[in-house]
Amino acid sequence: MPAKPRHSAWFQSLANPSERYGLDEIVYTDRNGGLLQVVHDMEALKRTSGNRWKELFESRQHKSEWPYGSGVWGKKEWVLPELEPDNVVSMYEGHTNLFWADRYGRELGLEDLWLKLCGNTHTGSFKDLGMTVLVSMVKEMRARGKAVRAVGCASTGDTSAALAAYAAAAAIPAIVFLPRGKISIAQLIQPVANGAIVFALDTDFDGCMEIVKQIADKDGIYLANSMNSLRIEGQKTVGIEIVQQFDWEVPDWIIIPGGNLGNVSALAKGLDMLVELGLVTRRPRIVCAQAQNANPLYRAYKRGFESFEPIAALPTLASAIQIGNPVSYVKAIDAIKRYDGIVEEASESELAEAAARADRTGLFNCPHTGVALAAMEKLVANGTIKKSDRVVVVSTAHGLKFIDFKLKYHEMRIEGVESYFPNPPIELAAKYPLVRDAMLREIERRFGKHAA
């Protein structure tokens, strides 16, 4: 028989460290309804030096040995160390590229701007990083005889796509609850295509979340939202991966959009492990960017985190973060405090214009990335972010999931947004003189009279 792993992890109450559960137990909160976190045996992990961890992670990168070629499972000892490899459900997620935004950065006065393109993955968003972990654990639970009938989630689009795909790969039934008419067609069709049971409910995300929590509590459906801390274990690898891609050098800033706030919490957790296990010695500053129409964390930040109050989120172009009562606010506040962090907001106009401005330099941004870019632009303008700082913006989803947003922007049909960078197609008769004149006129207008 193979030797058992030397490393271990468990669920632990945030409020009461003595309250623990096994990762294969069906539990989402502590006895008082508070959040759980996955805690690792750090003393066991520290028996391996920081340099040895670097060597191990580098040796697995982009390799085909199962399951270590995945950006998540290449760090298995830090994620789910005791999971049987045969129960891993992976689509080789992670390893998404860092885009050096040279032209966009120069336009803003930044010398070292990068975007972490988490949308360049199987279902088009960072949610794959967490869902591979959760669905793998569910597969193992079912193999052990646990009574898990199906997995379910409330979603504003990206979570449902990831859950449906990974559950389909594992032959596990998936049930998703979406706010009717509030997500893009591309986001809706993904769980439909992957065979999930899809409910479109006449409510917002928070209303869908209340329904799925009741179903998880009463009907044997395993909850896959980010209040389930297993998701955080996969999502935390984005911070680790960013540092690894910079040859283990820590950037000055990491800017990330926030809705349900699991992602900013996960980012900090991954960075914490890098420091505690000796791979790096410094921390970046973290910025959490929220849409102005769904900004409870920003409001709490402006009050010095004296209190946190849920709000009724208003409609926003950044539909995936239209969340007024985020589950992970306690973890997010802790992360912001410990990382000398900032919470910034972006109006609908600011997020749309920032996304379009960056698109003109070769990117293709989702509206949520637009929120992060707009926050960054504000911090550059007020001098908080300096010219020479190395800045990484986490782009959370692929722009192709939001083509309606793109089309309406360029057709100047978004209410309250002026569209400073519209680029609608030029419709002409198919006659060479007309086409030539229009082409030369546009080249001169856009690039100057002496454009090469």
Outline where the language-model segments fall.
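PLP-dependent amino-acid enzyme catalytic core
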Residues: 1-452
